[in-house]
Amino acid sequence: MRTGRIERNTAETRILIEVNLDGRGNYDVSTGIGFLDHMVEQFSKHSLIDVTMKVDGDLHVDQHHTTEDSAIALGQALGEALGDKAGIGRYGQAYSPMDETLSRVALDISGRPYTVFRAGFSQEKLGEWDTELIEHWFQSVAQAAGITLHIELLYGTNNHHICESIYKGFARAMRQAVELDGRKGGAIPSTKGQLGG
């Protein structure tokens, strides 16, 4: 199985992340931020990537360090699990509807991190989570995992639906991208013979 495990300990956060790309969408998530937990659980369930995420962060300061560091560690764990990326689909895309909301996510596990995030929120918090941190979470995951990531809200008004639609779209796109394609015979999905750089 393709698995990754990252322990990241700083003066601001203590984090343990484990992922299994060949999982069933099982999760055990505790970040101290309820809405972030809910979104990571959605990611796991709809990508079928098993995720354990345990975070002890300095939430008495604010939510930035916990959000950023957990995303970095998740991206690193995904990168470790992907290894040399031999045989993967590499690309993934999904339209993700949720009631009045529709979002689109497209990504390339290219080894060249880049994020385009075209979505906004009309309220400052979802639960207790600062909505300004949502874009930063995706940027941090993409940077650490080496993913080119494009996220676009096509339309929608309910902030909860917008966020959940984006996370589910990301999950479904990742499921496509990490799945192994037997026709590739274990080859690296690039004419260069490697991904990144």
Swiss-Prot record:
Alphabetized UniProt keyword annotations: Amino-acid biosynthesis, Cytoplasm, Histidine biosynthesis, Lyase
Subcellular location: Cytoplasm
One GO-annotated biological process of the protein: L-histidine biosynthetic process
One GO CC term on file: cytoplasm
Pathway: Amino-acid biosynthesis; L-histidine biosynthesis; L-histidine from 5-phospho-alpha-D-ribose 1-diphosphate: step 6/9
SUPFAM superfamilies recorded: Ribosomal protein S5 domain 2-like
Domain of life: Bacteria
EC number(s) given by UniProt: 4.2.1.19
GO molecular function: imidazoleglycerol-phosphate dehydratase activity
Catalyzed reaction equations: D-erythro-1-(imidazol-4-yl)glycerol 3-phosphate = 3-(imidazol-4-yl)-2-oxopropyl phosphate + H2O
UniProt keyword annotation of Cytoplasm present: yes
Presence of keyword Transmembrane helix: no
Protein family (similarity comment): Belongs to the imidazoleglycerol-phosphate dehydratase family.
NCBIfam families tied to this protein: PRK00951.1-5, PRK00951.2-1, PRK00951.2-4
Descriptive protein name: Imidazoleglycerol-phosphate dehydratase
Organism from which the protein derives: Erythrobacter litoralis (strain HTCC2594)
Lineage: Bacteria, Pseudomonadati, Pseudomonadota, Alphaproteobacteria, Sphingomonadales
